[in-house]
Amino acid sequence: MQKKQTILVVASLLVIVLSVTLAYFTAQIIGEGKNISVTSADLKIVFTDTDGNIEGNGITPGWSNSKTFTVKNESNGTYRYDIIIKDLINTFKTYKYLQYKITSTDGGYNMTDYSYLPKSSTKEDVVLAYEVSIDKGKTHTYTIEIKYANDESVDQSIDMGKSLSGTIYIREFTKPTMKLTDKLMADNPTIGTRTTFTAFTETNTGTLYKATEQIGTNESKDVYYFAGDAKNNWVKFGKTTESSCIYKGKEVIYVNMTNQIRRNPENETECTSTNICDAGGVYGVGLTESECSGIDGTKWITEKATWSEAKKDIYWRIIRTNVDESIKLLYAGTSPDSDKAYVGASAFNTTTNDPMYVGYKYGTTGSLENNRLNTNDSTIKTYVDNWYKNNLTAYTKYLSKDAVYCNDRNLESGQSYSTTSEFAYAPRERITNKQPTYNCTNMSDAFSVNNTSAKLDYPVGLMSIDELSYAGGQASTTLTAPYAWYYTNANGESSYGSSGFHSLSPFGWTGSDSIVWAVNGSRNAGILGYSRTVYSTAVRPSVSLSSCNLISRGDGSPENPYEVYTGNGVCE
């Protein structure tokens, strides 16, 4: 069937040309605005705005323009359609200030937050709303708003003289056919091979690097990974309930002096547990009045913070392909410019006095063989599993059950296992010598849903230190700008603030403390370091999209991330 396409905008073409003098923006609309009613065999689309002119020619950052239209199904059954921008050209340099939002109050596609308008230097059709279903005789009423957000904290003059043009269309939905893996390879035609694994921060787009992976004694296969300051490894997949604890427009910190905890409140109870302790405009809860008063420069405010929750899209960064052709992802927050690319904070294990506590799961004490019995969940696994249960269970069918998350407990060369004397694990030797590997040779360390020797309850884990080394990190070495992708958000800043985060990889045993590899935050940008298992750090889950997934849209950029098709008939 030939695809039906119906125009929706004010005229056959809406072109907005923005030019700038300093911070002053002007806009010109080409095309007259009129009432338009276009009827196909299946849909009737009515553009209800009386004209398409922006109010005045002179606008500043903060400008917005809205258009309203209706879609009525006059066919004999349910109809599925897409809302697209045809022939989009968007040459704005910034990615986050030019935004759009589609709203509908009568069953149509509805966005709760603004999304970034994708960039395109050449004409490109871009889907804004995918597979919208409308029943026979029903009408969907829409408002589309496009705005240029004002940010007084930055110089927005980089967008001077840039342009935006395109046409909003309705088209009949057609199920996508390209697999995400194929799209990834097509969008990254440059394949490199690295032999030196010092810190790597080179900016790149359209580049993958090749390595190999072997699980147990299975066949070794080629895998492909992103490294350095990769710009096109963004994915939007799943939704989460994002919470915030706010006082006077600022986020509040939860402090527990007894347990030496300092983090974001995890629930409404923590957020409103006490009055506010004001430390010079940094607001805390969880302290008693006497604890607050005992800190220099603070004051006790007899008011409460406010707790709120909202559904948000989840953004991820592609780590690599796996040996089963799935695609492994690292959690990157609820927006590309997030500085909270973590789901909370947790110790790796709340006990440290035995080597077995470096295990993502562990067994009993006394020997490495006993440690690998994997009958107990680590503290961090419990935390990750609970997050998954609360956020991603509806998406389980899209995730690989064979993808491996390697908790390599092999010993370093020349080391002997002991519960009383210090020793090191193999990842310390590899990363110190800049020789990472994707291989996971012992099946009791190769955690996956389908591996009975190291069985996961859910298809989720953590990133290994070897994966972080391949991505561009180096032991005891601070990254320099433009950094490596695992460290940065779309603004080129730390995506997880000053917090560090645990990797999945063991480091060693001191004779009294179990140690795991970890990654530093902004105080020591992206250093691959280590931490006692009892230290609470940020938690960044990792999942793997199955090879059966189809790509619905996107090019991997932060403003136009890859999106997985989650309709019927995929990964069943």
Please provide the spans of the model-predicted regions.
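C-terminal, structured domain-capping segment
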Residues: 63-79, 84, 88, 128-176
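Short, solvent-exposed aromatic-acidic interface loops
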Residues: 86-90, 334-336
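Long, domain-scale functional regions
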Residues: 176-572
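A surface/secretory-pathway sequence property marking extracellular, secreted
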Residues: 38-47, 89-126
